[in-house]
């Protein structure tokens, strides 16, 4: 019984460690890279689809940051008008 409980505890610890390695998505905890598109991801994260374009994770994050910044600037300009 003790070994079963230790095994379950080890599985929980490993699952949480894998989730912390890729904090963008809590759904795909058993995969190191999420392969879903943002629209199909249950949590709506942009952790995905960069493998299809050949981008690295850093390039994808930088592209997303630029997109969010330009979207925010356009929104602020529309509020000023």
From Swiss-Prot:
Organism of derivation: Thereuopoda longicornis
Chief site of localization: secreted
Signal peptide coordinates: 1-17
Similarity-based family: Belongs to the scutigerotoxin-02 family.
Keywords linked to the UniProt accession: Disulfide bond, Secreted, Signal, Toxin
Molecular function via GO: toxin activity
UniProt keyword Phosphoprotein, yes or no: no
GO cellular component, one term: extracellular region
Maturation and modification: Contains 3 disulfide bonds.
Subcellular location: Secreted
Protein name: U-scutigerotoxin(02)-Tl2a
UniProt key word Signal: yes
Tissue: Expressed by the venom gland.
């Amino acid at each position: 019984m003790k070994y079963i409980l230790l095994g379950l505890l080890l599985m929980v610890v490993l699952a949480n460690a894998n989730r912390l390695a890729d904090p963008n998505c809590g759904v795909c905890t058993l995969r190191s890279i999420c392969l879903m598109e943002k629209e199909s991801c249950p949590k709506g994260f942009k952790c995905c689809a960069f493998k299809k374009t050949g981008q690295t994770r850093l390039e994808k994050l930088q592209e997303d940051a630029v997109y969010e910044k330009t979207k925010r600037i356009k929104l602020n300009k529309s509020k000023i008008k």
